[in-house]
Every structure is written in C-alpha cells, then in structure tokens.
C-alpha cells in the first residue's frame, strides 16, 4: 500500500466565545448571530444546511459588547468597546450605518416591527435609533447607573409606543415614545434589573398594561398601569434565583404565565396569580447560569443562553401541554467546547465524536460529511451528565457502542448506546481511586456483545482492572467499588493507558519518563521502557505488528519492539512536547501531534517526516483516527477542530493528469511555432505560464513580421503582426496582469528589454489606459517598469547622440577631397 502523504481538511472553529455579549436570534429562529472576541458570526440554522452566512470582522479590533438581530432577520445591530454602533444589512452583507455613541453599551433591544433600536449606555443615557435611516429619534436621560435592561412595547398602527428601561441601581423607568417623556419611575429593586416585559391586560374603560421586572435581588415585581394613572405594584414574588431574564407567556387556555431564568442555570415557569412554580428545567451538575433567553416563533420556543456559550432549545408550548414538572431540552448548540483533552469516534456508524473537555459532562458531536461540496456545520451537541468534576480522558470500543470516561472526581463511568433512544446511558460507575482518574482503557475485542473489563489509571499512582457486568434488562446504574486487582504503577502521574490489539497486555505512560508493559490477566509487570529524557504523554500499540510508540515532553516519538523491549526508531522534528501518537496505514506510518500545534506524519521504516499538517494555533491535546488513517481529527486548546481526509490517491491522479496535459500542450506549442501560428503559440505559452517560451514566441514573431510591417503614413502601426496584435488586444484583466509581469521581468535585462518595450507598446495601443489603471496590481507593476525604461531610454539617447560624431567626421572628411 502506498504511503499516505496528502490530507485535505476543514476547520471547525468556535462560533461563540470570548465575549460578554449575549447571542441573538431572529424571530423565526432561522438566523443566529454570535460574537467571537472582536468578530461576529451570522449563521443559518436551517436543518441540514447550517452554514456561516457572514463573518463580520470589527475594524476597530475591539471586543463586541452587545448585539441584536431585528425580529425580521434583516439587520444586525452591534456595539463594540470602541463605542461605535453599527448596523449590518444581511442581504447586502455590508455595514450600512455607523455612529459614535456617548458611552459604552452592553444592552440593545429592537421593537417588534424591526424599525427602532434602543441603545442603553453606561452613563445612564438611552437613545432610540431609526434602523433603516440611521438617525436618532429619541434621547432619554434620568438613570443614575448603567442601563442593564431594555424592552419595547408597541404594535404596528398602534397609538401606544413605550420603552421600559432598568439600571444596575435597581431603578425602572417607563418612557412614552409618542410624547417623548418619562411616564413612571419605579424603585422597588435593590440590585441590577436584568429582565423587563410589558403586556396588555383587557379592561372595559381603557387599555391597561402590566409591567414585569426581574433583578439580581432574586425577586420579580408585577406592576399595573395605564397611560393616565400612576403605576401600582400588584405583587412581589421571590424566585430564589438571580434573574437574568424574565417575561410573559400564555398557555393554551389564555392563562398568563411568567418565565424567569438566571442563577443555577434554571429556567422556570411561574403562575402569575399564585406565584407557584409550574415547571422548571433540571439544574445541571456544572456550575453554570443562564445569561439570556431568546424567544422565537411567538414565544412558543426559546433558546437558553448559558454562561459556557451553549444554547439550549426548549419547546415551551409543548411543555405547557404535558403533565410533567420538568421542562425538557430538545436540542443544544455548542458555541465552543473549551479545551478538548481527548476524543474518540463513537456511534453505530462511527459518525460522532465523543469529547472529554474542561467540563464534567460528556459531550458528543456529529462528524461533518466531507464527501459533499459543502459540509453542514455540526453545531448540535449531546450533553451527558454523570461526573461531578472535569473529564481527563476517554476511550471507546471499536464498534462505537461503549464509552469509558475518566474524571477528576476520582471515578470512571462506562456508557452504553441505547438503540431505542439513540442516546448514550450510564451503564456502570466505578469508585475506588483516591485521586483523579487520568486514563481509561476498554478491550479491543468485544466478543460477547459487551466489553468485559475496564482499566483505569489515577493520580494516586495506581492502575486498576475492573469487571464490567453482563447487560441485564434493568436500566439501573451499577455502582462498582471493588476492582479485580490494583497495582502501584509509577512514581509520578500516569498520563496515558493503551490496551494491546489482542487484549493480552497493556501499557502505561507516566511523567516519571517511563512506559511500563503489564500483563492484563494478572496485572504483573512485564517490562519497563526507559529511554526518554522527559515525562511521557501518550502510548499506542501497533495493530499489525509487535510495536509500541511513545510520545514525550522531550519532543520525540520512539518506536519500541515488544520482542526485545528496545528502541527501534526515534522520530525527531517537533519543536515542543509531543502530546499524542498513533500508528496508521497498517503500521507503515505513524501520526503525532504536539504542543507546537503541528501534526506530523512519519514513515516508520525510515523515520522520515513525510508531511506536516499545520491547522492549529495552540497546543494540540487530542488526536483520533478512523479507517487506519483515512480520516484524522485533531483538536486544540482553543477548541478548534480540524477534520483531515486522506487524498493521496486523488492528488497523485491529478498530478498525473496535469503532467499528461502539460506534455500535450508543450507539443502543441512546438507545432504552432513550427507552423508560424504565432497567435495560438502566444496564447498557449500564456496558459502554460512559461516566461522563456513566451519570450521566444514574441521574438520569433517579431523577426518574421518585420519585413511585412508597413508604417507608411495613414496606416495602423503593427507591432508583431496583425493576428498577434489582435490577440493581445482581447486579453482579459488576469492575462494582462500576467503579461505585464513578464514585461517587467524582461525589462530589467538589456538583452530582452526590446521585446518587453514592444509588448508594452502593443498593450497601450489596444487597451484604454484608464481601464488598465483600474486593474488591481497594475499600477504597482508599472511603477516597477518605469525606472528601467528610463535607463534604457537614456542609453539609446546617448547612442544616438554619439552617432552624430560619425556624421560630423564624414562631413569633415569630404572637405579634404
């Protein structure tokens, strides 16, 4: 089998990270906008064709502080730390308005008609902007602190247009946009007001309105007011959580319901009359909180924005109809995955990736389809809770149906794929280590339909072998506290564990600079491999031979013989610690990645680095392969994935086709030149991009056509010949740039400058100078041509001047006779 030397990859970058701004979504739920530091991603959420529509780079390179999509999805408004408000039109893909605001802003709101935008500043001021026309319609002052919440009220053709605002001091104000004045000032909160909503209440006399306000003082206030009488506090409800968002809903019977979200990452529905909690989401194990709620589809569904930049979709309308007390999350979108420590291909079709990240939850994401012309963004993430602290590593069986995870909570968990729900369930939990579990290993041979054992390594410097119970009809999680054996393995932390292909031995790699080989059946030490100068990060068995690879902080990978337990090859080339290594291509090659952000593909027989894949800017922690190296996925500390696909055969075929075509074209060029077909020879030489052959074509064409050129008065000047001049006259912009570049190079040499000058003359005769100057890069090329042209002109002018001496001498000689 040929060596794999060429890979093509696609990058999957975090879509939401490094910004305090809350993501925003259009009312129909199809367009999502998320900040990434000083950039913004606008994403099409249409199932099956998810893609980034626009990527906005902030010219001032300042972090995005607030952004808001208009409900109709036509405009995106955003503010950066540079205090610039910008309005981006999605259809044209351009910023149509930009204006300076008086202070930094962290809150924006758009009205239901997508015509008005409210901007709240840290100086307590509020401006209302006409989105389409880009001018300020209102300016309000009166708050004593930073504006922390805004909410429009008003419908198309309505006479009542209001804006409610809250600040960090707990003050709430209601502004009349028609009369341009403050209607009410409310001071019942003792902390920042983060949620506001207004709803109309049926009244016989005149429309009455209810105002809802929620703050970080763990309470929500319900007010009643109209356009004439004072605002009346109806009730204050303690909600036992810091409120980051709140609003009104209606159930199927028209009953008014209040939702709140915030602390403890809990979203809850509250009866507005009794104040009792009707339903709520489960509290996650990880310490998170909800930073925003994004209602879509007329409040029937909502995106919950978590502090780890995960978006969870809930169907409020359906949840209100059922009798369950818990609100179920229907799907999740991962803004980023943080630091990916380890990963494996899982699922019945191995089309998913299980991730161990800096989170207690096991994350599983879909693998993008690289076979199509454009892969749909794999934004969905399945989140499985079970551990109470961060995951260190994981392993999976070859069929992808069983996963083992290792955590800092001193436990390991085995997960089983449920064919009915198409989800993974906790199968067994292993408790027994006295420190963090750092590595796990499952058998490579699953003969009875389930893995029979689990290996774990821990920071307590021990390794344990556990029995995995036989599956039963019961779905109860089995807690295993007694291991089959425990061995003191190393003197320092154990970083990796690998099981041999035949499940007879296993290897451990440690910071103590050694790799140890153990008998899997009885746990006895068989060999100690010590040749590295620094701690080991990874160890991997070869599936097709008795070989073992270890990677180390000494920047090397070593290949060991399992017969002699000696080093066969030392692979050097990384500039930093090598984090992962694995055999591919039936042991002919080895792949490694390191803290230098590079992936290297090695020839095991020669020790030569065949290919270096550069797609990361940070330390590579995770690397996984499938189909013996046909597919590779790598992930770094920034949460960036690179999916690599082997295209060696395709590239070889393309190179062969390219070489074949080049031979045919070169032969055609020779035929054209021998026939004197200078036009086709010129065009083909341009296509081949052979400077010397192009020069020879022009030179020979000039030599053969000089005798035929007629420069009598009244006739058009011909530079080469009429056909070739005509061919130059119809060149496109790209061809003109290429030809001018060749003229620039020829013009630097006294032997070739004549052809260069004639070619330039021909171009200037047949092409408009103004249009030539508009071609990108043309002016720069001309600037490089001018100095040498002036030098050639001076030299020719001096020769002409010197020729006058000969004329003078001849005249004087005639006088002697």
From Swiss-Prot:
Function, as annotated: Involved in nucleolar processing of pre-18S ribosomal RNA.
Gene3D superfamilies, per the entry: YVTN repeat-like/Quinoprotein amine dehydrogenase
Miscellaneous: Present with 8070 molecules/cell in log phase SD medium.
Keyword annotations: Nucleus, Repeat, Ribonucleoprotein, Ribosome biogenesis, rRNA processing, WD repeat
GO BP, sorted A to Z: endonucleolytic cleavage in 5'-ETS of tricistronic rRNA transcript (SSU-rRNA, 5.8S rRNA, LSU-rRNA); endonucleolytic cleavage in ITS1 to separate SSU-rRNA from 5.8S rRNA and LSU-rRNA from tricistronic rRNA transcript (SSU-rRNA, 5.8S rRNA, LSU-rRNA); endonucleolytic cleavage to generate mature 5'-end of SSU-rRNA from (SSU-rRNA, 5.8S rRNA, LSU-rRNA); maturation of SSU-rRNA; maturation of SSU-rRNA from tricistronic rRNA transcript (SSU-rRNA, 5.8S rRNA, LSU-rRNA)
Organism of provenance: Saccharomyces cerevisiae (strain ATCC 204508 / S288c) (Baker's yeast)
A Pfam family recorded for this sequence: Utp13
Quaternary assembly: Interacts with snoRNA U3. Interacts with MPP10. Component of the ribosomal small subunit (SSU) processome composed of at least 40 protein subunits and snoRNA U3.
Annotated protein name in UniProt: U3 small nucleolar RNA-associated protein 13
WD repeats: 59-100, 102-139, 142-187, 191-233, 238-280, 386-425, 432-476, 489-528, 531-572, 573-614, 616-654, 664-705
Main subcellular localisation: nucleus
Locations listed in the record: Nucleus, Nucleolus
InterPro entries: G-protein_beta_WD-40_rep (IPR020472), Utp13_C (IPR013934), WD40/YVTN_repeat-like_dom_sf (IPR015943), WD40_repeat_CS (IPR019775), WD40_repeat_dom_sf (IPR036322), WD40_rpt (IPR001680)
GO terms for MF: U3 snoRNA binding
Keyword Nucleus on entry: yes
Gene Ontology cellular component list: 90S preribosome; nucleolus; nucleoplasm; Pwp2p-containing subcomplex of 90S preribosome; small-subunit processome
């Amino acid at each position: 089998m040929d060596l794999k030397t060429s890979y093509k990859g696609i990058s999957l970058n975090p879509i939401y990270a490094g910004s305090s701004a809350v993501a925003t979504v259009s009312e129909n739920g199809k367009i999502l906008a998320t900040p990434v530091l000083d950039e913004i991603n606008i994403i099409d959420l249409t199932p099956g064709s998810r893609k980034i529509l626009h990527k906005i780079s902030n010219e001032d390179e300042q972090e995005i502080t607030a952004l808001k999509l208009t409900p109709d999805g036509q405009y995106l408004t955003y503010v950066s730390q540079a205090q610039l408000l910008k309005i981006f039109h999605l259809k044209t893909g351009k910023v149509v308005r930009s204006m300076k605001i008086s202070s930094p802003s962290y809150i924006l709101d758009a009205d239901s008609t997508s015509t008005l935008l409210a901007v709240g500043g840290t100086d307590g001021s509020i401006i209302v902007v006409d989105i389409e026309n880009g001018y300020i319609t209102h300016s309000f002052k009166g708050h004593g602190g930073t504006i922390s919440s805004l909410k429009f009220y008003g419908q198309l053709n309505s006479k009542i247009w209001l804006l409610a605002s809250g600040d960090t001091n707990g003050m709430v104000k209601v502004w009349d946009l028609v009369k341009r004045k403050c209607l009410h000032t409310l001071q019942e909160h003792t902390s920042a007001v983060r949620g506001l909503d207004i709803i109309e209440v049926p009244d016989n006399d005149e429309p009455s309105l209810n105002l809802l306000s929620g703050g970080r003082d763990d309470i929500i206030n319900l007010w009643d007011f109209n356009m004439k009488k004072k605002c009346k506090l109806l009730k204050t409800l303690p909600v036992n959580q810091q409120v980051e968002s709140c609003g009104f809903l209606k159930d199927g019977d028209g009953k008014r319901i209040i939702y709140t979200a915030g602390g403890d990452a809990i979203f809850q529905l509250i009866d507005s009359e009794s104040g009792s909690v009707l339903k709520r989401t489960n509290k996650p194990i990880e310490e998170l909180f909800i930073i925003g709620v994004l209602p879509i589809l007329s409040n029937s569904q909502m995106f919950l924005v978590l502090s780890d930049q995960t978006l969870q979709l809930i169907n409020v309308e359906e949840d209100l109809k059922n009798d369950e007390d818990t609100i179920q999350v229907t799907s999740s979108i991962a803004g980023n995955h943080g630091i990916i420590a380890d990963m494996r291909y899982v699922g019945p079709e191995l089309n998913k990736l299980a991730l161990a990240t800096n989170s207690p939850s096991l994350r599983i994401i879909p693998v993008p389809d690289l076979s199509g012309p454009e892969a749909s963004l794999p934004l969905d993430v399945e989140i499985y809770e079970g551990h109470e602290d961060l995951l260190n590593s994981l392993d999976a069986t070859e069929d992808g149906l069983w996963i083992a995870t290792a955590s800092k909570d001193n436990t390991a968990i085995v997960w089983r794929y449920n064919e009915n729900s198409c989800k993974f369930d906790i199968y067994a939990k292993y408790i027994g280590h006295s420190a963090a579990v750092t590595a796990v290993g499952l058998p490579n041979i699953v003969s009875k339909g389930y893995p029979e054992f689990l290996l774990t390594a821990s920071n307590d410097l021990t390794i344990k072998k556990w029995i995995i119970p036989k599956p039963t009809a019961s779905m109860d999680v089995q807690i295993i506290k007694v291991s089959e054996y425990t061995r003191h393995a190393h003197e320092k932390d154990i970083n990796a564990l690998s099981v041999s292909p035949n499940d007879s031995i296993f290897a451990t790699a440690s910071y103590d600079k050694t790799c140890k080989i153990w008998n899997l059946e009885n746990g006895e030490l068989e060999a100690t491999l010590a040749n590295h100068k620094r701690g080991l990060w990874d160890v991997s068995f070869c599936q097709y031979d008795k070989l073992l690879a270890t990677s180390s902080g000494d920047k090397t990978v070593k290949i060991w013989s399992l017969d002699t337990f000696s080093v066969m090859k030392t692979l050097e080339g990384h500039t930093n610690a090598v984090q992962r290594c694995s055999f591919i291509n039936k042991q002919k090659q080895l792949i490694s990645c390191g803290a230098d952000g590079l992936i290297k593909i090695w020839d095991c027989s020669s020790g030569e680095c065949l290919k270096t894949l550069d797609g990361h800017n940070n330390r590579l922690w995770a690397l996984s392969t499938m189909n013996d190296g046909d597919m590779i996925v790598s992930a770094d500390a920034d949460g960036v994935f690179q999916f690599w696909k082997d295209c060696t055969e395709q590239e070889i075929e393309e190179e062969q086709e390219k070489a074949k075509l080049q031979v045919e074209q070169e032969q055609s060029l020779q035929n054209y030149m021998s026939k004197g077909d200078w036009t086709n020879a010129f065009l083909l030489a341009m296509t081949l991009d052979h400077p010397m052959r192009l020069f020879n074509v022009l030179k020979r064409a000039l030599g053969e056509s000089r005798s035929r050129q007629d420069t009598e008065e009244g006739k058009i000047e011909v530079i080469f010949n009429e056909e070739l001049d005509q061919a130059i006259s119809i060149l496109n912009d790209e061809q003109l740039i290429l030809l001018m570049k060749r003229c620039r190079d020829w013009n630097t040499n006294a032997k070739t400058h004549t052809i260069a000058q004639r070619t330039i003359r021909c171009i200037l005769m047949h092409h408009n100078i103004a249009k030539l100057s508009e071609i990108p890069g043309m002016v720069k090329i001309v600037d490089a041509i001018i100095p040498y042209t002036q030098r050639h002109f001076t030299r020719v002018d001096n020769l002409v001047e010197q020729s006058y001496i000969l004329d003078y001498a001849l005249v004087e000689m005639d006088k002697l006779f």
